[in-house]
Amino acid sequence: KRQKDGLNDAQRYGQALAVMRGGRAGATQARQTLAGLLQGRPDNLWLALALGEAESRAGQAAQANSRFEQLLRQHPNSRPVALTYAEILNEQGTREAGQRAQAMLRPLLSQSGNDPVFQQRYARASELAGDSVRASEAYAEAAFLSGRPEQALLQLQALKRNPALDYIGRARVDARIESITPTVLELRRQGVQDPDLDRR
């Protein structure tokens, strides 16, 4: 239905998502719009997720986290809920937020491991949580899944020098290096180069 601003609900939702990117003031404005929309559609998951994002970006992290925790209880193992909440926790940037995001994403690794966005979020969460080994592995996997196998290989080779890498982790990294290397060699043979790598 159209409101006095001349926009229907779908347009107001889209506008709220756009203004949310405009810093705290935009997020505050988006929060008000989304809260109004959610009142009319209390079971709409996408509105609830967007409202949680807006709350966090408007400086209301505790309220946002409470909303996301409730959504997780209502939708356990939901990738959209987990990925959105992980993004927000990563933006909050604390060690505790990283630990919460890492713990929430870990059970989804087996079914989402081939998703570069998932790997990026898991990598950042692990980094914030102080788990440098898992962070490096996930960043390398994200690079590979984004079409950057040489970058992934270099990251994994660097990870092997990390003193925090234990025997099991080293075996896992060695196996991944072994599986990626043929792809990298074939790309080199074809003359395909990763433009982001410094070849001086």
Model-inferred region functions:
Residues A61-A62, G93-G98, L128-E137, L165-G169, ...:
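Alpha-helical linker/edge segments of TPR/alpha-solenoid repeat scaffolds
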Residues G36-L37, Q70-L71, P107-L108, A142, ...:
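Canonical positions in the second alpha-helix
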Residues P42, P76, S112-G113, G130, ...:
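Short coil turns that delineate tetratricopeptide repeat
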